[in-house]
UniProtKB/Swiss-Prot annotation:
Glycosylation sites per record: T142, T152, S153, T154, T157, T163, S170, T186
Organism the protein comes from: Bubalus bubalis (Domestic water buffalo)
GO biological process, one term: protein stabilization
Stored Pfam families: Casein_kappa
Protein known as: Kappa-casein
Function, in words: Kappa-casein stabilizes micelle formation, preventing casein precipitation in milk.
Amino acid sequence: MMKSFFLVVTILALTLPFLGAQEQNQEQPIRCEKEERFFNDKIAKYIPIQYVLSRYPSYGLNYYQQKPVALINNQFLPYPYYAKPAAVRSPAQILQWQVLPNTVPAKSCQAQPTTMTRHPHPHLSFMAIPPKKNQDKTEIPTINTIVSVEPTSTPTTEAIENTVATLEASSEVIESVPETNTAQVTSTVV
C-alpha cells in the first residue's frame, strides 16, 4: 500500500512541473511567433492514471493474489474473508455470512457502484506453514535451586474410651457396670 502511494506521489511530482510550465506560458504574453510545445498532449494527459495502470500491474487486475500465507480466519488480516459453511448452518443463517462490498479502487476514473461485491479467488493461504525447528539446539533442563521447606509431622496420641456393657445371662441381678477399654491412636497432623 505504501509502495503504491509513493509511486503515485513520485509520478505526480514528475508531471506537475510540466503542467505548471504550461499554465505559466498561458499567463505570459507570447513573445515568440511560433508556439512551442515541449511535450506531446496525448502522452501528458494520460500520465497520472492510464500510464500508472498500464505500466504497473499492481494497479491493474490482479489474477494472482500476492498475500502472505496465513489462516483465513486470522484476526490480524487486514481484509475480511468470511467462510460460507455448506451444510453446517441452516439457509437463514447462511444469509448472514456475506462478503463485504468491494473496496478495491476502480480501474477507470468512474466510481464503481457499491452493490458490486468482491469474490475472493481461491488460494492456498489457508495452509499454515509451521516454523522450522532448530535441531542443533539441545534443551537445557531447568533445575529448581529453591528448596521448599515441608512441615514436619508430629505424632499425637489421643485416648479413646470404649464403653461396652457386658450382660451375662444368669439369675443374679447384674448391675450395669460398663467396662472401659483404653486404646492409643497415633495420627500425623500436618
